[in-house]
Amino acid sequence: FVTNGTSTSNKMVWHHTVAPGDVVVVDRNCHKSILHSIIMTGAIPVFLKPTRNHWGIIGPIPRSEFDIDSIKAKIRANPLLKDVDAETVKPRIMTLTQSTYDGVLYNTETIKSELDGYVENLHFDEAWLPHAAFHPFYGTFHAMGRKRPRNKHSVTYAT
């Protein structure tokens, strides 16, 4: 257990898994502790871009953003990664805000199965979703749960 809160938990996950120059995949609507972690570890981010409505309110990240080919395209387009081969590099971590400040939830099992083995560590920032593990309504909408299969290759973190 961490008594300092989720910001510290997020930084602990990142400092444990990420090294300078690592490619990381991050929710563009992430918490500032993730931005701090990017800076402190020296990681190079590619961002998953959420939708916005005509009032500018942030919505969900489209499913297509989680496609491996889409992530590789983001790596190729990032000027900080011009010397990185998008076909061979494996992102060190993917961090997703789950749920968002507006209550958007993602099906974590879908994301885990899509990225398992491509991204080494799957990190779900669940600071706004601690109750999900205690109610069946949320099913696969939280990162870890009883009697749910583990990833074959990637490590999953929930903070």
Short names for language-model regions:
Residues 1:
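Glycine-rich active-site/cofactor-binding loop and its immediate structural neighborhood
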